[in-house]
Amino acid sequence: MTERMQSITAIYVPLDGMNAKGLVVADLTAGDDEETYQRTGKVNLTTTTAIRLLLDKAADVDEAVALLKQYDMNSSIGISHHLSIADAHGKSIVVEYVNGEMLVSETKVVTNHYLTDCEKRGVGSAQSRERYDTLAAYSGPAGAPQVRDMLESVAQKNYPKTDG
């Protein structure tokens, strides 16, 4: 795929983004390869199109959750997903789909393992949980230098490639 085509595609199939109201949405793998296929009779939506929908229509976390509840979620690329959603008011959540049910949990940190209170809580790599613990140890407001340090502390180069 050409670079131009990739750039155009990214507009319609984002994996993360922030809108003008300050809503931030990111798609992360959730820790296993169980795909989501909700079948409740609502309109179907894939994880990547959900991100576009939320960035276009939601101003905050509550609006994002209300929008997601209107659709049946379906995995985009054959893996489990969870959505990290935060807004300009400081509210942040993770949305996960387990056994066809949408689960929501407040959290300031999301890595690549399940976080909601369900039978899959904690499923994912040890590295994911270690990165989560490292980031969760930071507290309070963070300026650009602190955010840079936080991201540097959990950079892939700091972890063995054998444990996701």
Task: Explain the meaning of each model-derived region.
Residues V13, D72, V98-E101, R129-T134:
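A general structural signal for short secondary-structure boundary/capping elements
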Residues D27-L28, E34-T36, I93-E96, L103-E106:
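Short helix/loop capping segments that flank catalytic or ligand/cofactor-binding pockets
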Residues T29, L68, D87-H89, E96-N99:
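Short, structured patches in soluble enzyme cores that scaffold and shape functional sites
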Residues D16, H81-D87, S92-I93:
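Short beta-strand scaffold segments in enzyme catalytic cores
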Residues D62-L67, S76-I79, A88-G90, V110-G164:
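C-terminus-biased signal that marks the final domain/tail of proteins
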Residues M1-K42, I79:
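A contiguous strand-loop segment
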Residues V95-E119:
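A cross-kingdom feature marking charged/low-complexity
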